[in-house]
Amino acid sequence: MTTKNSGASAPRPPKVQFEHPTQLAATTFLRAVAVDDAAAIWECLSRETRGLLEGHYAARAAVALHRAAGVAPSGEDARLALVVAPLRDSIVGALGGAETLGGFGISGARIVDRATAYVLLLPDFGEERIVTEIDWRPSHLLAFVHESREWLVDLGRTAELSVDAGLPDPLGAIRR
């Protein structure tokens, strides 16, 4: 995967950073998905992704969008589990079941730009070691955007960067 460069030279690959907040954010997100903690999943999502999920919920539930918007991250909002369920189901299905989510390794972060980074989800390949690209294919990518001083999972960037990298989108099976 390469990043776009405004100059005439060839695109440069993203910078790899081995200790980056997205690694912990990815682990936190996958754990929340594995244990079906809707509030924790919601807290890990970007504003745009939350809006997309609220819109998806509104369409499925046949309610006005303004009634679906503003889902509270606390367990007190009954809509939260319904809004997050399609995303969770998509991830669990794409990654082989809730019980396998803890087996994925998290790569060093790839920094696309100041506000975008991604990590690769590496399948369980045994003991900790440096792996080659062939060892982790097929893998998945999880993209983050930096907003409100946090790195948050972003559905749109994950889809876009997954396609660019030729990887399956772990969030892409969300359907009506």
Each language-model region and where it sits:
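Solvent-exposed, non-transmembrane amphipathic alpha-helical segments
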Residues: 49, 61-65, 73, 164, ...
